[in-house]
């Protein structure tokens, strides 16, 4: 999803010059409760059972590394979008606020669509906007 897209672009910036990240909250900002649920088990399989801040699983950690290493030339252009009804909107706002604070380093654009959530209608609209942002043709 959106987290994975943004994570890949920040972890491998020499591979990705642009990224479209839709509903891209940082997994490090979600509260982890090991309640033996399927969700908790999947999280442990992916990230382990420890806090993932200050690790390569944390989006802001990866973004800070690019800044610290002065790799602005490699920093991907980021198009980030979320629907106003998305259940993870608050986590997206944390990511948005981070990149807006570092907009002198990152070419960052955020779009929030009113009245849409974590749904195909939102993604279809935003995918077309991202393709335009990236200078790629939109085929209809």
PLM feature segments, named:
Residues 1-140:
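Non-catalytic cap/lid and distal C-terminal segments of serine-dependent acyl enzymes
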């Amino acid at each position: 999803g959106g987290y994975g897209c943004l994570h890949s672009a920040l972890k491998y910036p020499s591979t990705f010059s642009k990224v479209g990240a839709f509903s891209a909250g940082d997994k490090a900002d979600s509260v982890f409760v090991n309640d033996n649920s399927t969700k908790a088990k999947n999280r442990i399989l992916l990230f382990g059972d420890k806090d993932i801040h200050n690790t390569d699983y944390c989006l802001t950690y990866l973004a800070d590394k690019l800044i610290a290493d002065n790799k602005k030339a490699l920093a991907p252009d980021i198009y980030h979008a979320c629907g106003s009804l998305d259940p993870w909107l608050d986590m997206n706002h944390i990511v948005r606020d981070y990149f807006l604070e570092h907009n002198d380093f990152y070419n960052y654009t955020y779009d929030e669509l009113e009245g849409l959530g974590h749904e195909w209608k939102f993604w279809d609209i935003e995918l077309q906007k991202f393709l335009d942002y990236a200078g790629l043709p939109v085929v209809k």
